[in-house]
Amino acid sequence: EEETSFKLWSPTATTVQVVVYESASNDAPILKKYEMKRGNSYSYSHKDNTIGVWNLTVPESLAGRAYQYQIDFPHHQSLTRDPYTIATSPDGKRSAILSEKERQVEGFEVKNGTEATWRLENPCQAVIYEMHIRDLTKSETSGVAPELRGTFLGAAQTGTVNHFGQSTAFDYIKELGVNYVQLQPIADRHKEYDADGNVTYNWGYDPQNYNAPETSMSTNLNDPGQVIRDLKTMIQAYHDAGIGVIMDVVYNHTFSTVDAPFQTTVPDYYYRMNRDGSYQNGTGVGNETASEHEMFRKYMIDSLLYWVNEFNIDGFRFDLMGIH
């Protein structure tokens, strides 16, 4: 809590700076730029190999502020989010720095083995209900409190009924008798807005920041840690009800390549490319990630482990698994 560390793998960069902003808002001015140092220790072990890894430790807490990386390459410069960012400013535009305390929720605990009593010994016994946070809670007929509609906390609210007095949302799921819910994508995604400024409908298959929960499902968009606490609270409620939580993940493509932190940190590495420099398109959405490349495989594993160890996620559904 008394220092802030940054690491970035960008082996083709010539210089890298951490750009820290005064707050976590999208329009916050720059507070300071810090020069990062390039690692030069070679090892066959990923943990010990620092070649191409840029490091910086600032001897103070920068929690609550947004940041980006300014990266110089031989022929261009990029300003980008952290590929490993766990929290963002609204709409996922900038990475956000959080302290461990800002991620904690009273009563939330990651459990494994026999302590995870809601998990099944035999996966063939799973009865899975696929759900979308917004679909479950956004309608006025959901009975969910207006301030919680479309949010993680809304999906865990109890005592909700429709106009006929029938159970809705969380209570409805509990009455179904299922033992797992499969959440359609809850990681940060690209968003568009209508003329009234409302987020347009989206199932979530436009990934933008893989390790950060979707900010529009937070009860406080101005606090980058709130969405993490809200999601943990929701997951704990389902676990307490004896229901496991499966997460739908979309590692096969990103919404954008130009603005994606993959392309802006290691150009032309994380995506499958054609000989003419264009993107391969096996996904049908304009690009596909290169899971045959070692560092993207590592990224996927790191990301999955983060969701398990931080949020106690019980399983994953892989979108377009054939791409991998």
Language-model features and meaning:
Residues 1, 31, 35, 46-157:
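The feature marks proteins involved in alpha-glucan
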Residues 2-7:
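Structural beta-strand segments of beta-rich domains
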Residues 16-18, 67:
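Short beta-strand elements bearing conserved aromatic residues within extracellular beta-rich modules
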